[in-house]
Curated annotation (Swiss-Prot):
CDD domains per UniProt: SH2_SH2B3
Keyword set includes Phosphoprotein: yes
Domain SH2, first and last residues per copy: 119-217
Tissue: Preferentially expressed by lymphocytes in lymph node and spleen.
Protein's UniProt name: SH2B adapter protein 3
GO biological process: one example: erythrocyte development
Length: 368
């Protein structure tokens, strides 16, 4: 009985979220713990430990009040090797955010690296991305687009046409815009695309899967109140583009396809377009409406600079006007086509399920 009574009065041990007071001289300046409350109401910063919890003995002082709190110095213990290093995790609630709801800033930190480019389609689905790159079948081998990943927030996917089939390659972007694709690292997504324009995409299946980026899908917002229409059936050739499109578009050679599915006009452009400024992310137009260096003087025999991967795309208003003019002239030839895939192509209309297929399986599919 006496033992039980003494057990009730033993000092209780509990964990303390604040390990060391701010005035502890043993704690290095670079490892100061975070305060439990910072700034005005609404800015709440909480910290907790994962792994070992440090005990805090609270003995009774005079008149039954809590006495001085003793907390062992975790820095000295970690240096001596008695305990494993601690990992401190912080949770930050911004003003207006409900407590307990974690914000996902991954997309917000990396979207601005891609949102200015015409080949970035944002949060479209895998099936929609596969449809866009499969529109021309095997003829659009190497056509690509970049989109946000559906299953992994903050990551991106390169969807491209491989011999008429849509394949998906995951991209990882850092907060500084650096890009990683499998074992390859690039300073930016632009450098990655330029690399895959010159070198095959690493699918590890030899020459049968040799694919280089040859064109990209451009999405232009459709004018409000207009119903989507098919602009061309078999694609716009270079001759028709020179006669039916404005001066800046007459310079395009080998335009693959121009359609308007869903709620937006979709244009597939090859890489032989005028230069696209990869750093500023917007086109440069001269006073005559033609890209700099691609006017009449450049067409008379001057040597053009090496081909670039990103090129001039006009403003959405100008491109919408040109597409509208092209619709009026080619609507008669588009009545007998609804762009439905045939039975052989319809089986490959969707993307490769919900999970990313291993590269070895992609190689086997390509060899079939």
């Amino acid at each position: 009985m006496a033992g039980r009574t003494q057990g009730k009065h033993r000092p209780r041990v509990r964990t303390c979220p604040s390990l060391v007071p701010f005035d502890n001289p043993c704690w290095p300046p670079s490892h100061q713990p975070l305060p439990l409350q910072v700034g005005a109401p609404g800015h709440r910063v909480t910290s907790f430990l994962s792994g070992r919890a440090w005990p805090s003995y609270i003995p009774k002082g005079k008149h039954g009040l809590p006495g001085p709190r003793y907390v062992p110095d975790p820095w000295s213990l970690g240096v001596l090797g008695h305990v494993a290093p601690l990992r401190v995790t912080t949770t930050i609630f911004l003003p207006g955010a409900s407590p307990g709801v974690m914000l996902d800033p991954a997309c917000q930190k990396t979207d601005h690296f891609l949102s200015c480019y015409p080949w970035f389609h944002g949060p479209i689905s895998r099936v929609r991305a596969a449809q866009l790159v499969q529109l021309q079948g095997p003829d659009a081998h190497g056509v690509f687009l970049v989109r946000q990943s559906e299953s992994r927030r903050g990551e991106y996917v390169l969807t491209f046409n491989l011999q008429g089939r849509a394949k998906h390659l995951r991209l990882v972007l850092t907060e500084r815009g650096q890009c990683r694709v499998q074992h390859l690292h690039f300073p930016s997504v632009v450098d990655m695309l330029r690399h895959f324009q010159r070198s095959p995409i690493p699918l590890e299946c030899g020459a049968a899967c040799d694919v280089r980026l040859s064109g990209y899908v451009v999405v232009v917002s459709q004018a409000p109140g207009r119903k989507p229409k098919v602009v061309s059936r078999g694609g716009v050739t270079a001759s028709t583009a020179r006669t039916k499109l404005p001066s800046w578009l007459r310079l395009l050679h080998g335009v693959i396809h121009v359609i308007s599915p869903g709620s937006s006009n979709t244009v597939l452009f090859p890489f032989s377009l005028p230069h696209w400024d990869s750093e500023l992310g917007h086109p440069h137009l001269s006073s005559a409406g033609c890209p700099p260096g691609h006017g009449a003087e450049a067409l008379r025999g001057q040597v053009t600079p090496p081909e670039q991967i990103f090129h001039l795309v006009p403003s959405p208003e100008e491109l919408a006007n040109s597409l509208r003019q092209l619709e009026l002239e080619s609507v008669s030839s588009a009545r007998d086509s609804d762009y439905e895939m045939d039975s052989s192509s319809r089986s490959h209309l969707r993307a490769i399920d919900n999970q990313y297929t291993p590269l070895s399986q992609l190689c086997r599919e390509a060899n079939l």
